[in-house]
Structures are given as C-alpha cells and as structure tokens.
C-alpha cells in the first residue's frame, strides 16, 4: 500500500512517501502546513484496496505541547479513488475543542511540529456511515466570523469624530470603542464554541 497512496497540497509536488505504522495505518508528513488550505488524497492506481475496504483519511495539526490528535476528514475507496479536503479551519477548530479529537494512530507517537495525514484501512460500510465531525462546526464558525466582520465594517463606515457630529436629540450614538469591545468578545466566544449563539 505504500506506493498506492498520494497527497497533493496546492502549489506543491505530489507526495507518495507514506510510512506504514501498522498493518492498516499509514502516515505522511505535511511540512509548513500553515500555508495549506486544501489537500487531495488519492489512490495512485498501483494497488487497489481489498474488496469491501476503504481508506479513512485523518488530519493532525502540530501541537508543540501534546501528541498528535486526529480529525476524521472523510475517506477514499476503489469507487472514489480521490477526495479534496478543506483543512484551513481545522487548526482553529482543534484549538477550540481542547484536543477532544481521538488519537487513532497511537498514544506513543512523538510530538511533532509538522502536520500529518493518516490513512487507516477500514471496512467501507463503516466509513460510509461516518461524516466529518468538523463540517457543521466549520460552517457555523465561518458564517459567524463573516457576519461579525461585516457588521463591524458596516458600523465603522459611519464613524465620525465628536467635532463632526451634528446635534440631533432624536438620534442615539454609540462609541465605536463599544462596538469594538463587542466585536472582540463575540470573536472570542465564537472561537471557544461556534454554537454558543444557540443557547
């Protein structure tokens, strides 16, 4: 299986140097992962998966203070030999989750500053029932972030100094610093829990 798997990061050469860490688990390092937004994981065509099997694809961001934690991205199979995965928001989500992702590739792996892609060969029927855990959270986070930025930019476009203000007893004014404080607090809460607004 070593030469049967490949990874492409935008603007980089194809990587096929997976390392086998167990009979059914393979890892590859992604250097300078902060500059990577999407990865393509694929079968090279040299060796197909065994009948009924597929490759679960996991991603791990580096954490200098802890062993790798793995986030399920999706899977590839003989009938779906490649997949594109968005990873740009996974680092933020991993930090927010306080490393709640499962360490499926062993607890004894050394701490790494290089991101990794892991492929675990598993029954395809099991993988078809799984969905990436970060999809909904990622969408909420992105929507909330864009909405707050849009609101802040809109309000800021109307800012004037006190000397430019026209007295109007029927108009209420809010200092821009108050909006800035709200914006900062909202962003912090959104990073801690993208679904906080539901409660």
Swiss-Prot record:
<dbReference type="GO" id="GO:0005829">
    <property type="term" value="C:cytosol"/>
</dbReference>
<dbReference type="InterPro" id="IPR008493">
    <property type="entry name" value="Hikeshi-like_N"/>
</dbReference>
<comment type="similarity">
    <text>Belongs to the OPI10 family.</text>
</comment>
<dbReference type="GO" id="GO:0030544">
    <property type="term" value="F:Hsp70 protein binding"/>
</dbReference>
<dbReference type="GO" id="GO:0006606">
    <property type="term" value="P:protein import into nucleus"/>
</dbReference>
<dbReference type="InterPro" id="IPR048364">
    <property type="entry name" value="Hikeshi-like_C"/>
</dbReference>
<dbReference type="GO" id="GO:0061608">
    <property type="term" value="F:nuclear import signal receptor activity"/>
</dbReference>
<dbReference type="InterPro" id="IPR031318">
    <property type="entry name" value="OPI10"/>
</dbReference>
<protein>
    <recommendedName>
        <fullName>Protein OPI10 homolog</fullName>
    </recommendedName>
</protein>
<dbReference type="GO" id="GO:0005634">
    <property type="term" value="C:nucleus"/>
</dbReference>
<dbReference type="Pfam" id="PF21057">
    <property type="entry name" value="Hikeshi-like_C"/>
</dbReference>
<dbReference type="Pfam" id="PF05603">
    <property type="entry name" value="Hikeshi-like_N"/>
</dbReference>
């Amino acid at each position: 299986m070593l030469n049967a798997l490949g990874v492409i990061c935008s603007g980089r050469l194809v990587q096929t140097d997976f390392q086998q860490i167990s009979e059914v688990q393979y890892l590859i390092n992604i250097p300078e992962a902060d500059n990577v937004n999407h990865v393509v994981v694929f079968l090279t065509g040299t060796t197909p998966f065994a009948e009924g099997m597929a490759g679960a694809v996991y991603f791990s961001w580096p954490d200098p203070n802890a062993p790798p934690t793995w986030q399920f991205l999706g899977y590839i199979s003989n009938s779906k030999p490649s997949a594109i995965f968005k990873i740009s928001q996974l680092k933020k989500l991993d930090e927010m989750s306080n490393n709640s992702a499962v360490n499926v590739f062993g607890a004894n792996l050394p701490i790494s500053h290089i991101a990794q892609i892991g492929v675990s060969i598993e029954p395809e029927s099991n993988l078809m029932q799984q969905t990436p855990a970060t999809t909904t959270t990622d969408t909420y986070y992105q929507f909330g972030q864009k909405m707050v930025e849009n609101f802040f930019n809109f309000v800021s476009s109307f800012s004037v100094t006190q000397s430019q203000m026209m007295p109007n007893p029927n108009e209420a004014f809010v200092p821009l610093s108050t909006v800035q404080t709200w914006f900062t607090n909202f962003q912090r809460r959104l990073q801690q829990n993208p679904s906080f607004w539901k409660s």
